[in-house]
Amino acid sequence: MEYLPLFAQLKQRPVLVVGGGEVALRKIALLRRAGACVSVVAKKLHPELAALEQEGALRWLAQSFEPAQLDAVFLVIAATSDAALNRRVFDEANARQRLVNVVDDQPLCSFIFPSIVDRSPLIVAISSSGNAPVLARLLREKIESLLPASLGRMAEVAGGFRDRIKARIPTTDGRRRFWEKAFRGRFASLMAAGDTRAAEAVLEAELDAPQGPQGEIILVGAGPGDAGLLTLRGLQVMQQADVVLYDHLVSDGVLDLVRRDADRICVGKRAGAHAVAQHETNQMLIDFAREGKTVVRLKGGDPFIFGRGGEELEAAKAAGVPFQVVPGVTAASGATAYAGIPLTHRDYAQSAVFVTGHYKPDSEPFDWALLAKSRQTLAIYMGTMKAAEISQQLIAHGRDATTPVAVISRGTREDQRVLTGTLDTLNILAKDAPMPALLVVGEVVQLHQQLAWFQHSTDAENLRSSVVNLA
């Protein structure tokens, strides 16, 4: 081990920075976050440093470096472009046994700065000992994506309970078990949801009368297909799951991100064909949660946009089971973006309407006159089976038969297909489109050829011709 990782307490400690340029600015920003009292030795200051000096946030010594400036400081940073001056600062600091860092010159450093993941008071530091700083930065980015922002506040709350828990639980093993349960259970979930008061109440209750494991249901939007569109929060939750109930619309790439030892159960639905009845899915969610498990309900797109997520949470609420919701990128947003079709555009559409083509038989019929208005974009989910009716009704209620339309199949995935045509050919386009598919109606569709960027997007005009010819 070339370096011993240490965390320095710099609050109100004097730190000297030699240099007043952009490199010094970056280091000073870090030092100020740690509460250091910063003095800067430089003839000139970067404008942002000058502003900080005017605010009294740092002390400026507008002079040349002198060894006496090191006498009362805790550590030193040399951040100049003058190699001889940097060497002199290093030698003088070493002679006085001061910690010193010459920026980007590892041999002239008695300490180095790591890459930092800041969830204060929780801090993660990553270092390659100066050998591969880019690798350390990439590792930091990965860790950033895995650690929720709520960890810092959770650590603060836990710190506030330490003395009480130590007094109530005398053994080290007992305290370790208490905190492991807290950090893996309902306390952590409530902190992630921002409900500090309820989280503290959970710790209080656990101290007064230890409970069995408490489960919960977390509704997660998996996005339209491309695993890269999964939210960070969604990924974090999937890594904590004991059980995952997922739909057919969830892509293999997203499922691959689920915790390896979590149980996976497909409760998939397609229009008119349910692998598991909705009431059975609701009961499974409740039963698993009552066993103390973290149950992730993974749904394609966004769970609250034609995903029946509201019905599932109504059942959970009625059963007294706690739950959370993690929104996702809905198909109307993701698929159109990957197809180069903006939902709104000042020249073509001032509004966008999301509609489901698979509605309850006893529900009120669509307001076709409203949907047929021009200068708006219709995004129709689960509409391929009713494409003929949709086309006929829109035309009958005033939408021009030559209105551009698109059928986006398996949007955002590697095998995405985009078929374009006009409203009077919508049924032909939709007839053989691979599922899942989104129907888009509106003048914005004509921008597809110009704005298509996704490498798997198909030549729209050729596809349109082939589909029409097949008909």
UniProtKB/Swiss-Prot annotation:
InterPro entries assigned: 4pyrrol_Mease, 4pyrrol_Methylase_sf, 4pyrrole_Mease_sub1, 4pyrrole_Mease_sub2, CobA/CysG_C, NAD(P)-bd_dom_sf, Siro_Cobalamin_biosynth, Sirohaem_synt_dimer_dom_sf
Catalysis performed (reactions): uroporphyrinogen III + 2 S-adenosyl-L-methionine = precorrin-2 + 2 S-adenosyl-L-homocysteine + H(+); precorrin-2 + NAD(+) = sirohydrochlorin + NADH + 2 H(+); siroheme + 2 H(+) = sirohydrochlorin + Fe(2+)
EC number: 2.1.1.107, 1.3.1.76, 4.99.1.4
Keyword DNA repair: no
Region span, Precorrin-2 dehydrogenase /sirohydrochlorin ferrochelatase: 1-203
Stretch list, region Uroporphyrinogen-III C-methyltransferase: 215-471
Residues engaged in binding NAD(+): 22-23, 43-44
Presence of keyword S-adenosyl-L-methionine: yes
Modified positions (Phosphoserine) in chain numbering: 128
Residues at the active site: 247, 269
GO biological process: cobalamin biosynthetic process; methylation; siroheme biosynthetic process
Keywords linked to the UniProt accession: Cobalamin biosynthesis, Lyase, Methyltransferase, Multifunctional enzyme, NAD, Oxidoreductase, Phosphoprotein, Porphyrin biosynthesis, S-adenosyl-L-methionine, Transferase
Gene3D superfamilies the record matches: Cobalt-precorrin-4 Transmethylase, Domain 1, Methyltransferase, Cobalt-precorrin-4 Transmethylase, Domain 2, NAD(P)-binding Rossmann-like Domain, Sirohaem synthase, dimerisation domain, Siroheme synthase, domain 2
Pfam families: CysG_dimeriser, NAD_binding_7, Sirohm_synth_M, TP_methylase
Binding site for S-adenosyl-L-methionine: 224, 300-302, 305, 330-331, 382, 411
Biochemical pathway: Cofactor biosynthesis; adenosylcobalamin biosynthesis; precorrin-2 from uroporphyrinogen III: step 1/1; Cofactor biosynthesis; adenosylcobalamin biosynthesis; sirohydrochlorin from precorrin-2: step 1/1; Porphyrin-containing compound metabolism; siroheme biosynthesis; precorrin-2 from uroporphyrinogen III: step 1/1; Porphyrin-containing compound metabolism; siroheme biosynthesis; siroheme from sirohydrochlorin: step 1/1
A single GO molecular function term of this UniProt record: NAD binding
Function of the protein: Then it catalyzes the NAD-dependent ring dehydrogenation of precorrin-2 to yield sirohydrochlorin. Finally, it catalyzes the ferrochelation of sirohydrochlorin to yield siroheme.
Annotated family: In the N-terminal section; belongs to the precorrin-2 dehydrogenase / sirohydrochlorin ferrochelatase family. In the C-terminal section; belongs to the precorrin methyltransferase family.
Protein name per the record: Siroheme synthase 1
